[in-house]
Swiss-Prot record:
Protein's recorded name: Nucleoprotein
InterPro entries on file: Flu_NP
Subcellular location: Virion; Host nucleus
Oxidoreductase found in the keyword field: no
GO cellular component: helical viral capsid; host cell; host cell nucleus; ribonucleoprotein complex; viral nucleocapsid
Function: Encapsidates the negative strand viral RNA, protecting it from nucleases. The encapsidated genomic RNA is termed the ribonucleoprotein (RNP) and serves as template for transcription and replication. The RNP needs to be localized in the host nucleus to start an infectious cycle, but is too large to diffuse through the nuclear pore complex. NP comprises at least 2 nuclear localization signals that are responsible for the active RNP import into the nucleus through cellular importin alpha/beta pathway.
Organism: Influenza A virus (strain A/Swine/Jamesburg/1942 H1N1)
Listed SUPFAM superfamilies: flu NP-like
Amino acid sequence: MASQGTKRSYEQMETGGERQNATEIRASVGRMIGGIGRFYIQMCTELKLSDYEGRLIQNSITIERMVLSAFDERRNKYLEEHPSAGKDPKKTGGPIYRRIDGKWIRELILYDKEEIRRIWRQANNGEDATAGLTHMMIWHSNLNDATYQRTRALVRTGMDPRMCSLMQGSTLPRRSGAAGAAVKGVGTMVMELIRMIKRGINDRNFWRGENGRRTRIAYERMCNILKGKFQTAAQRAMMDQVRESRNPGNAEIEDLIFLARSALILRGSVAHKSCLPACVYGLAVASGHDFEREGYSLVGIDPFRLLQNSQVFSLIRPNENPAHKSQLVWMACHSAAFEDLRVSSFIRGKKVVPRGQLSTRGVQIASNENMETMDSSTLELRSRYWAIRTRSGGNTNQQRASAGQISVQPTFSVQRNLPFERATVMAAFTGNTEGRTSDMRTEIIRIMESARPEDVSFQGRGVFELSDEKATSPIVPSFDMSNEGSYFFGDNAEEYDN
């Protein structure tokens, strides 16, 4: 990590603030959440949504997407300069679902972006409140992480589909700032860098001229973000090599892929935040909750509390299982797509099943789907316990570089042991250790080989009763260690296609 002095907590990243004490952080995160809630209430009034319709997660997503699109400066500028048929660059909209005569009706709405921006600023004391926008982006990203697999994107960049647990935040827009960078997985950063290097290989002007200078700065910044996620000196030294390369090419791509593989055992630090749909915040504000006064944290008990007493609905397709839809959204709310299923199940108090066994498609409904057969049901988003979200990779003892769980990027700071067959993963590292990074590669492989499967991650950390808001008495669960529960294995989910 960066030196202690420059390290900001997630909440500071989230609210763009400088160093603050815990109370100030809780207040500024609360202010951000309250702003989202007030905006949502105002939009429901504008759209004349009934209470039930306002609690529909599909309506929430449409409203969130509208405000994100209204503030997307780059795309707005692009749309104005490249007018495409049938797209008004000044308008934004989407499907709103209404309940009419016992049936769900889809209505496509269109709003002036300027009007949406006005409502958003008004809800946020006249400010642009970028932090709130980023928060909604992270919620959408967490939902995508739980819904789609990125096998195709991995294969396209020359990575292995088994690296899917490194892909948190792979659908976050570039403009998501420090808070966005904190939640991106190692694989996501590697993929962004490889795409950049490939463009440089194919387009000789990519690194040249005034634009090239900006590109180079962006490249080095991304390298530093990735370097900060690694926890061993050898991995970081290798990142320095990649960053300082005069003319990044295939050697750098090789190094990055090696690093991504190594991150399957030597886990990177990736932040996890519980970002909830806007309608949940709207409900709380409407019921008189003052987020700024009470304070709020994205990594503590608060989101669990909020979900305990919020009723959110979802449209359900004819052959979908409402319990499975609930699991999908629960995982998205807690950013738990890459968590060990045993840990998630324990916290949720219901069995959380791998994605390949879910009878549910994504939450969003395509415009060509038939509304006649749509039903709706309540999402069960409550939990049995709560646990603190982590930003570490869950490697065993932090003093000496060591291993974390393979195929899992932990979300919750809860003790678990590491059931892994090191041999299967080490097989990925046979062969190439020559070249400029050979000594680092050798060192990384040595660290991985010395990792002991019987080690325990998050030693002594447990879950808490929902009545235990100060986290005083941890309950350390014991898991059946015969198998590690990855959500992704044996998977047949749809691909994410933008």
